[in-house]
Amino acid sequence: MGTQKVTPALIFAITVATIGSFQFGYNTGVINAPEKIIKEFINKTLTDKGNAPPSEVLLTSLWSLSVAIFSVGGMIGSFSVGLFVNRFGRRNSMLIVNLLAVTGGCFMGLCKVAKSVEMLILGRLVIGLFCGLCTGFVPMYIGEISPTALRGAFGTLNQLGIVVGILVAQIFGLEFILGSEELWPLLLGFTILPAILQSAALPFCPESPRFLLINRKEEENAKQILQRLWGTQDVSQDIQEMKDESARMSQEKQVTVLELFRVSSYRQPIIISIVLQLSQQLSGINAVFYYSTGIFKDAGVQEPIYATIGAGVVNTIFTVVSLFLVERAGRRTLHMIGLGGMAFCSTLMTVSLLLKDNYNGMSFVCIGAILVFVAFFEIGPGPIPWFIVAELFSQGPRPAAMAVAGCSNWTSNFLVGLLFPSAAHYLGAYVFIIFTGFLITFLAFTFFKVPETRGRTFEDITRAFEGQAHGADRSGKDGVMEMNSIEPAKETTTNV
C-alpha cells in the first residue's frame, strides 16, 4: 500500500460533512439563552389569542415542549438513517436533508412575525429530525472516507463540530448579539445559513468510496476517489478489502435492526455501541451544565453566562486535545480515562456542593471540578461513542447499527432532560452520586467488554467479532479478551 497523505480534497470533504455536526451542536444549545424572552413571547401570543393570560402550568408545559420535542425529532431522525444512506448514499443523504434544516429554520425564524407558538414547536421538531439524521450521516461518511491510520482523529472532528456549534450558540445568544427581544427569531433561524453553505459545497465532495464499491459495484469510480482523497496511486489493498467485504455481503440479505440482536456476530458490537452511547448521556454532562450557572453565581461571578461560555471553550479545547491523542492512546484507553476522571470529579462536585455554605473556598473547588469534568468528557465519552459505532460494523449492518446507536443516544438524552430536574429537586447535590455510579459501571463495562479498534481495518474488526461469536458458540465462553489481544493491522505511513 502506498504512502497516504492528508490531501486538500480529504480535508474539504470532512470539513463540509462536519457542518452537520455543527448544526446539531448549535440547535442543542441555542434554546437555553433566550428562555425568558421566548416564555414572554408564548405568554403574549396566547394572551392576544385568548384575551386572557395562560396559566403558569400551561406556559411551563409549552416551554418544556419546545425544548423536549427537539429530542423527540432526534429519536425519529436517528432511527431513519438507514432509509436514506442505503438508497441515496452518504453524501446525497446529507444534501437532501438540508431541506429539513431550511424548513425548520424558517418555521422558527418566522414564528414571532406569524404570532404562532405552533410554528416554534413545529420548527423545533423538524430541526430535531434533521439533527437526528446528521448524527448518523456524519460519523458514517467521515469513517468511510478516512485512511485507517487517521480514522479516529478525523472521527473526533464530528464531536469538535458539535462543541463548536454549542459554543457559537452560547455566544450568539448573548443579549447584545442575537439574544434580545427583537432578534431572538434570527438566533433560532440562523441554522438556515449553514444548511445553505453545506448544500452549496456538498456537490464538490465525493461519495463514500466504500458505498460506491460495496453497494453500487462501481470499482473504478471508488478507486479514483480513494486515490484523490488519500494522495496515492496504490490503493489496491484497500480496494481488495472492500471487494472481499462486498463478496461477503452478496451472500447475506440486508441486515435489519432485529437481526443485529439475533445474529451472534452482531449482538456483542450492537450492545457495546448502545452502552457507549448511554455512557455519554448518563455521564452527567448535561446536569453539570444545568448546575453550572448557579454555581458560578454562588462563587461570586458577576456574569455567570460568561463563565458558562468559558466552560464551552474548555469543551472545545479538550476536543482538539482528544483529536491528537486518539490514534496514539487508542479509543478504549481514552474512554476509560475520561470515565474515571469524570467519576472522580462528580464525587468532588457532590462534596463541594454540600460544603460550599460552610466553607467559602468550596465554590471555587466546585468550579474547578466542573471544568476538569468537562475536559475529561471531551477526552473520551464525548467524541468516541459517535465514531466507534461505524468502526465496529461492516458495510451491511452499519446503517442499522448507526440508527440503533443514535436512537439510544437521543432517547437517553430525552429521559435525562425529563427526569433530571425532579431528581435535582429531591436529591439536591446528591444527584451527582447517581452519575458517579453510572460512570463507574460504564468504566467496568469498557474495561471488560470494549475492544480496541485503533489501527484495524473494518474487515479486521468484523472478522474478530465473527471469530469470537463462533468461539463462544462452540465453547460457551466469552471471547472479548481474545479480541482485545489481536494485533492492529499494519499501520500505513501517513503524511500530513
Swiss-Prot record:
Going by the entry's taxonomy, the superkingdom of the source organism is recorded as Eukaryota
> Where is the chain membrane-spanning?
11-32, 65-85, 91-111, 119-142, 154-174, 184-204, 270-290, 305-325, 332-352, 364-389, 400-420, 430-450
> Which amino acids does the record list as binding D-glucose?
Q159, Q280, Q281, N286, N315, E378, W386
InterPro entries recorded for this chain?
A: Glc_transpt_3, GLUT, MFS_dom, MFS_sugar_transport-like, MFS_trans_sf, Sugar/inositol_transpt, Sugar_transporter_CS
Question: Could you state a single Gene Ontology molecular function term?
Answer: D-glucose binding
Q: In which tissues is it expressed?
A: Highly expressed in brain. Expressed in many tissues.
Bilayer topology reads: Multi-pass membrane protein
- Pfam families, per database record: Sugar_tr
Report the glycosylation sites. N43
Determine if Transmembrane helix is one of this entry's keywords. yes
Entry-linked PROSITE patterns: MFS, SUGAR_TRANSPORT_1, SUGAR_TRANSPORT_2
Quote the function comment for this protein. Facilitative glucose transporter. Can also mediate the uptake of various other monosaccharides across the cell membrane. Mediates the uptake of glucose, 2-deoxyglucose, galactose, mannose, xylose and fucose, and probably also dehydroascorbate. Does not mediate fructose transport. Required for mesendoderm differentiation.
Q: Which PANTHER family match?
A: SOLUTE CARRIER FAMILY 2, SOLUTE CARRIER FAMILY 2, FACILITATED GLUCOSE TRANSPORTER MEMBER 3
Description of its domains: Transport is mediated via a series of conformation changes, switching between a conformation where the substrate-binding cavity is accessible from the outside, and a another conformation where it is accessible from the cytoplasm.
Assembly, in brief, is: Interacts with SMIM43; the interaction may promote SLC2A3-mediated glucose transport to meet the energy needs of mesendoderm differentiation.
Give the protein's recorded name. Answer: Solute carrier family 2, facilitated glucose transporter member 3
Q: What species is given as this protein's source?
A: Homo sapiens
The organism that produces this protein has a lineage beginning with: Eukaryota, Metazoa, Chordata, Craniata, Vertebrata
